[in-house]
C-alpha cells in the first residue's frame, strides 16, 4: 500500500528537477502580456504569533480582500494564457517591486490592475521597450487608449480567472503544510500542472476588439 510519509519524504528530492522542468516549459514571448499577483496565506490571522513552519519567511501583507500572513505569488501571462514568468515573495512585498525582474527579457505591452500604477516603474519599463497599461484610480485622469489597447486592458481579468483556477484545482492551501520545502514543491507542481495542460482557456482578442469597435 502507498505510504503517505514516504511520499512526503520523496517530495524533497523532486524540487530541483521540477523547477528545471517548469522553467523549460515557460510560455513563449508574444509581445502582449498580463501581470497579476495572489496571496498565499500560511495560517489564519489569529494564529500568526503562534505560527512556526514559515517563521522568518512569511510576512504580513494586504490585498483588496484584507490582511493576510504568508506569501505572494506573482505571475506574468502571455495572450495564449501561458505563464511566462513567476516569482514568490513574502506577503509584504509590493506588487510593483518584482516587476522589473519578472519582465527583464520582455518587450511589447504589459497590462495590469491598479496595483501596478507607478510613474517611475512605467518609465523604466518603457526605456527598455515594454509599455505598461493599467486602470486608473478615481482621482487620476484617464489616458487616451486605442480601441485595441482598451480591449486588451479589459481582458486583464482573465489573469485573475487563471490564478483562481490554479489555486482551486491544485488545492493550493499552504496552511496544511508542516514543511517549507514541501510547500514550495506544492506551489511549483500546481503551476507546472497548469502550464502543461493543453486545454487552457483562450482569450479571444478579436471578438473583444470588435465589441469595443461597435460599442
Regions found by a protein language model. Give the residues of each.
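Short alpha-helical elements
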Residues: 1-215
Amino acid at each position: 500500500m502507498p505510504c503517505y510519509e514516504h511520499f512526503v519524504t520523496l517530495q524533497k528530492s523532486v524540487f530541483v528537477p521540477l523547477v528545471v522542468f517548469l522553467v523549460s516549459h515557460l510560455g513563449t514571448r508574444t509581445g502582449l502580456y498580463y501581470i497579476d499577483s495572489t496571496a498565499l496565506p500560511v495560517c489564519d490571522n489569529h494564529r500568526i504569533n503562534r505560527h512556526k513552519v514559515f517563521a522568518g519567511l512569511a510576512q504580513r501583507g494586504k490585498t483588496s480582500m484584507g490582511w493576510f500572513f504568508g506569501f505572494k505569488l506573482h505571475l506574468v501571462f502571455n495572450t495564449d494564457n501561458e505563464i511566462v514568468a513567476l516569482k514568490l515573495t513574502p506577503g509584504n512585498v509590493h506588487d510593483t517591486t518584482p516587476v522589473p525582474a519578472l519582465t527583464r527579457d520582455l518587450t511589447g505591452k504589459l497590462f495590469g490592475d491598479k496595483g501596478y500604477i507607478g510613474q517611475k516603474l512605467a518609465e523604466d519599463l518603457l526605456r527598455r521597450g515594454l509599455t505598461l497599461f493599467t486602470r486608473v484610480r478615481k482621482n487620476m485622469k484617464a489616458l487616451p487608449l486605442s480601441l485595441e489597447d482598451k480591449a486588451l486592458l479589459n481582458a486583464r481579468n482573465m489573469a485573475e480567472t487563471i490564478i483562481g483556477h490554479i489555486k482551486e484545482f491544485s488545492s493550493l492551501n499552504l496552511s496544511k503544510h508542516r514543511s517549507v520545502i514541501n510547500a514550495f514543491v506544492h506551489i511549483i507542481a500546481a503551476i507546472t500542472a497548469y502550464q502543461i495542460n493543453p486545454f487552457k482557456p483562450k482569450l479571444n482578442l478579436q471578438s473583444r476588439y470588435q465589441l469595443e469597435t461597435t460599442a
